[in-house]
A protein has these predicted regions:
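Auxiliary Fe-S-binding modules of radical SAM enzymes
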Residues: 92-99, 109-245
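Radical SAM/AdoMet-radical enzyme domain recognition
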Residues: 1-107
């Protein structure tokens, strides 16, 4: 894809399944970054959450990428009440990144159109994790204009970084620089917005680029300053699996 287009950077989001089998291929094909979902480093807890016992394979895949000097590795975990939100859990993830150049990010559980019961049961504020960071000498990192929604924290004793994505925090949307495209080809100005417009018809040919750009720029004036998740308004998003970053 990179060889035949003007796309300068390609990253991949994955649950890590078969990563130990394809890590070398991904590296050789020129992948620039990888985001891997690991909600727990406890093997039994991981198995209960995912329904499979593949944590060792996923960690092996990460090790293979590191041995290849692959730098841009991010690990994401959804912060879940009574599952991975204890001091011991935070310490375990800290030990994981202490000697590894890995960005580990906790994502605050978000309500969507179809997960209200799950959200009520497992949501816990991201401040529980940020309080831990502040008490343990982690310092927030200044971020550039092209940075994502995570606030990153550094500690001189650790090679890796901690990050937090806290959509319910004050001014979370203030620095938003994201648009979303669903699997069906709909442009969403906000992950939790109430409107969307199809751009699928403009993704068919190379000579449609200018028309596509004009459409997107025209839609930008409708981008709102904030979502309304704190009011329980989840917009068009029924579940996050249909929407890309």
């Amino acid at each position: 894809m990179k060889q035949n287009s003007n796309i300068p950077k390609i990253t991949m989001t994955t649950n890590g399944y078969r990563l130990n089998k394809i890590a070398k291929q991904l590296y050789n094909y020129g992948l620039d970054g990888i985001n891997i979902s690991i909600d727990s480093l406890n093997r039994e807890t991981f198995k209960k959450l995912t329904g499979h016992d593949r944590l060792p394979e996923i960690l092996e895949g990460i090790k293979i990428l590191q041995d290849l000097n692959f730098k841009n590795i991010k690990v994401n975990a959804v912060l879940l009440k009574d599952i991975n939100d204890t001091h011991e859990d935070f310490e375990k993830f800290g030990n994981f990144i202490k000697n590894n150049e890995i960005d580990f990010r906790f994502i605050e559980l978000m309500q969507t159109g179809d997960n209200l019961d799950y959200f009520k049961r497992y949501h816990v504020s991201a401040t529980k994790f940020t309080n831990y960071l502040n008490k343990n000498n982690w310092v927030i990192q200044t971020f550039g204009r092209d940075a994502g929604p995570a606030k990153n924290y550094l500690n001189p004793k650790f090679k890796g970084k901690f990050g937090v994505i806290a959509p319910y925090s004050k001014d979370f949307c203030k620095s938003c620089n994201r648009l979303r495209i669903t699997a069906k080809g709909d442009l969403r100005l906000c992950l939790f917005g109430n409107t969307g417009i199809s751009i699928r018809h403009l993704l068919q040919k190379d000579d449609q680029t200018e028309e596509l750009q004009d459409l997107i720029m025209g839609q930008m004036k409708f981008k709102k300053e904030s979502h309304y998740l704190e009011l329980g308004e989840t917009g068009l998003t029924k579940n996050l699996s249909t929407t890309g970053g």
